[in-house]
């Protein structure tokens, strides 16, 4: 079972679902468009930045990690 959350891909997917762009996110953060597009290719991210993005987009991206952790714990407990 894969236990990795590819956070950049998840953020890009959610932006698309919300009908928003990387340019929009760059304005909200604020940072360069280039920086945001580089974030999309990252598997990991600083927690402060992820917190800011979660707040801006009104999405708890930390839940992705918690869901993976809970599934892993269930597998371990159930043998």
Predicted regions and their residues:
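DNA major-groove recognition helix of helix-turn-helix/homeodomain DNA-binding modules
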Residues: 48-63
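Short, charged recognition helix plus adjacent turn
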Residues: 13, 19, 38, 65-79
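A short, Lys/Arg-rich alpha-helix, primarily the initiator
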Residues: 1-20
């Amino acid at each position: 079972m894969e236990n990795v959350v590819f956070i950049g891909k998840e953020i890009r997917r959610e932006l698309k679902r919300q009908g928003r762009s990387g340019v929009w996110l760059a304005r909200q953060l604020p940072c360069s468009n280039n920086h945001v597009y580089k974030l999309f290719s990252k598997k990991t991210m600083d927690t402060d930045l992820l917190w800011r993005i979660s707040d801006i987009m009104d999405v708890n991206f930390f839940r992705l990690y918690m869901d993976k952790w809970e599934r892993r714990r269930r597998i371990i407990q159930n043998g």
